[in-house]
Amino acid sequence: MLWENTEHSASEATLQYTMEPKAYENRFLPYDVLTNLAHVTMLHRQGFLDDGELAALRNALTDLYHEADEVEGEDVHTFVEERVTQRTEAGKRMHLARSRNDQVFVDTRLFMKDAAIDLAHRILDFADALRTFAEGKNVLIPGYTHQQQAMPSSTGLWASSYVDALIDDLKSLRATYRIVDANPLGAAASYGTSLDIDRDLTTELLGFSQKQHNPIYCSNRGKQELQLLQTLDLVMLDVQKFAEDVINFSEDQQFFELADDYTTGSSIMPQKRNPDILELARAKAEEVSAGKEAVRRIIGKLPSGYNRDSQQTKGHLIEGVDTVRATLDILTPLVESMELSDDFEVDAGIFAAYTANQLVTEGMPFRDAYHEVKSSGEYETHDEVAEPVHQPFGDLRAFWADEREAFDAMSERLLTAD
């Protein structure tokens, strides 16, 4: 432990209880190296490190980035500092003008930026799969209200409704990303530092669009994590509804046929082709929502400034990101392989409103036409298929492509700078 000495140490039980799971710490290792590279570059610029010390620190950090993939010891921050110090005495200067707190904050922001960009591209892939299905496999099916056949619809109109929903999710993710895209490094323990540091420089080096101005607000950890989880909860809300629809439309209504690759069998019933993926997606949506709610409750009653309670948000954040990523990765090829069935029936009653409208075009008042159709039970049908329709999203595709390019370029610059 970096803080331990002969006068103050903690029991093994205390240390074990307060340490983060290693799997979580491993995820933050590359981001911690990048933030250290930016920090020591700034310290050198401000005169706290000489040229030789900066070179030694840069060499040690870049080697660690490429060689280490598993954290040992207390946490990722201690691991990086100790490994660098084993290589060079300058490692003892690396923590100057910085707290463990703002190390955590800035690493988490980079993790969230990277995750948001990655998930946005997966959402786009899912939307593309649905759009392709909507345009290429569009047939007349009934539309439902109150879980009853109600009016004419189409597979294309249905699938493109989820494209529309995912575009809104991408807009929400972009708004969240712009809030997350602020540099908290320099907040130190919650109140800044008396040393002359350059927060604008670290903001530029780490590719943030702005710095987080108030150090206390930087330390009120959890709000940005909550905002990202809220957005992911919206994505999974759409996933949940989609899964329910496909289960119903492939089992009860027989509109769709799922490929064998995306179903499972029964240990006792040979005929079964179970939609386990879709059922698990419904459940995993609840897990993401529960993680969001847990973060809300963890941070909800904390006073301002840093509190260790907020450490517990990390696991919910990582698990939420991983769950959404895995779900999108399996649903996209499921949609790509989904076929239309030719073994379903359409109740002629779905044309009731259309029949009433036809009578209106012939001069009958709508209410009279309504009652005429209701009492006669006779319907005029048609075979027109509703076209897919959704809002455009080329600007969102371009935005996320630009952000991926910028994030990767930031990493490359820090790792290869002279």
Residue spans for each PLM region:
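A helix-coil-helix interface module used to build multimeric assemblies
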Residues: 1-192, 197-203, 265, 278-280, ...
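Glycine-rich cofactor/substrate-binding loops
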Residues: 1-35, 90, 269-418
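Charged, flexible cofactor/metal-binding loops and thiol motifs
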Residues: 109-124, 135, 141-142, 148-301, ...
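Charged/polar positions within long, soluble alpha-helices
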Residues: 41, 45, 66, 85, ...
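A structural signal for small-residue-enriched, beta-sheet-centric alpha/beta enzyme cores
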Residues: 100, 212-216, 348, 356
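Generic alpha-helical secondary-structure signal
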Residues: 56-57, 205, 358, 372
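Short amphipathic alpha-helical segments at helix boundaries and their inter-helical linkers
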Residues: 62-75, 224-228, 376-392
